[in-house]
């Protein structure tokens, strides 16, 4: 099954998650292979954050949420299921019922 590509740059692309937590749940993925955040060179990491900001802004512009979470799971113990670095951008709405394992 293919996922819908929603954005692309020279080094990254963004696709809708195949098992979304919320409508518009999007993954930001580097085109080059890295396993975790620690493997991504600093300059590319900065570019990844800028690209993630663009994706998050687009989700809000599309009215898919009133806020968003940005999450990156690194290694299996932290919930990483695919061993290719990626960032989850999860649109949120008031009362959506989504709960994470920690308290802010």
Q: Model segments located where?
A:
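HIT superfamily nucleotide-processing domains
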Residues: 1-104
């Amino acid at each position: 099954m293919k996922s819908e590509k929603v954005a692309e740059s020279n080094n990254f692309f963004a696709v809708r998650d195949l098992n979304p937590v919320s409508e518009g749940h999007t993954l930001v993925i580097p085109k080059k292979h890295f396993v975790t955040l620690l493997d991504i060179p600093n300059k590319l990491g900065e570019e990844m954050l800028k690209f993630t900001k663009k994706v998050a802004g687009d989700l809000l512009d599309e009215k898919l949420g009133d806020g968003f979470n940005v999450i990156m799971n690194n290694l299996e113990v932290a919930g990483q299921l695919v061993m290719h670095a990626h960032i989850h951008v999860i649109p949120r709405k008031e009362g959506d019922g989504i709960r994470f394992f920690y308290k802010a």
